[in-house]
Amino acid sequence: MSKATIELDFLGLEKKQTNNAPKPKFQKFLDRRRSFRDIQGAISKIDPEIIKSLLASTGNNSDSSAKSRSVPSTPREDQPQIPISPVHASLARSSTELVSGTVPMTIFYNGSVSVFQVSRNKAGEIMKVANEAASKKDESSMETDLSVILPTTLRPKLFGQNLEGDLPIARRKSLQRFLEKRKERLVSTSPYYPTSA
């Protein structure tokens, strides 16, 4: 039983020509731009893993003759025959990653992006080291924050009560009068200030 080759036009490049009348040059230019835009739109919707596998499979056929390149090749067993939707793409990627043994690891650091191919064990170790370093940094920042906060909270003094020695006597008395008047104003304008009966 022979296998029939079926070619599907996923990109929609082969449009049916209804009229065979010659087109003006400008119309040909517009059609060319439209078809290029259609190709870009279709390629942007395809899963990147499928494109990579297609490019890899065409790279393997580069030693064959030009005659065999014009005929569509039959898909191999390990390649998906139908494009996988993005929802199921993670399932397909995980199976290919298990075979290869390495996974891409993207690191964002100091404004730069780096991608490395590392094994799963190595990626886990890197993540563990990064988490430990981040937790140590958080603990050290908490210790410094507490050292700044605790001395001020251990001294529960109101503003204006510890003015001896900092200012000259005239300023000190003036500032104390100002703070007393301010305190009276705040108390008198509070919503729960008891009115005299």
UniProtKB/Swiss-Prot annotation:
Renumbered ranges of motif Jas: 168-193
PROSITE patterns, sorted: TIFY (PS51320)
Pfam families xrefs: Jas_motif, tify
Xref: InterPro entries: CCT_CS (IPR018467), TIFY/JAZ (IPR040390), Tify_dom (IPR010399)
Posttranslational modification: Ubiquitinated. Targeted for degradation by the SCF(COI1) E3 ubiquitin ligase-proteasome pathway during jasmonate signaling.
Motif (Nuclear localization signal): 170-177
Ranges of Polar residues composition bias in the record: 57-73
Effect of F108A: No effect on dimerization and interaction with TIFY11B/JAZ6
Single Gene Ontology MF annotation: protein homodimerization activity
Assembly: Homo- and heterodimer. Interacts with MYC2, MYC3, MYC4, AFPH2/NINJA, TIFY10A/JAZ1, TIFY10B/JAZ2, TIFY6B/JAZ3, TIFY6A/JAZ4, TIFY11B/JAZ6, TIFY5A/JAZ8, TIFY7/JAZ9, TIFY3A/JAZ11 and TIFY3B/JAZ12. Isoform 1 and isoform 2 interact with COI1. Isoform 3 does not interact with COI1. Interacts with RHD6 and RSL1.
Entry similarity comment: Belongs to the TIFY/JAZ family.
Protein's recorded name: Protein TIFY 9
Organism: Arabidopsis thaliana (Mouse-ear cress)
Gene name linked to the record: TIFY9
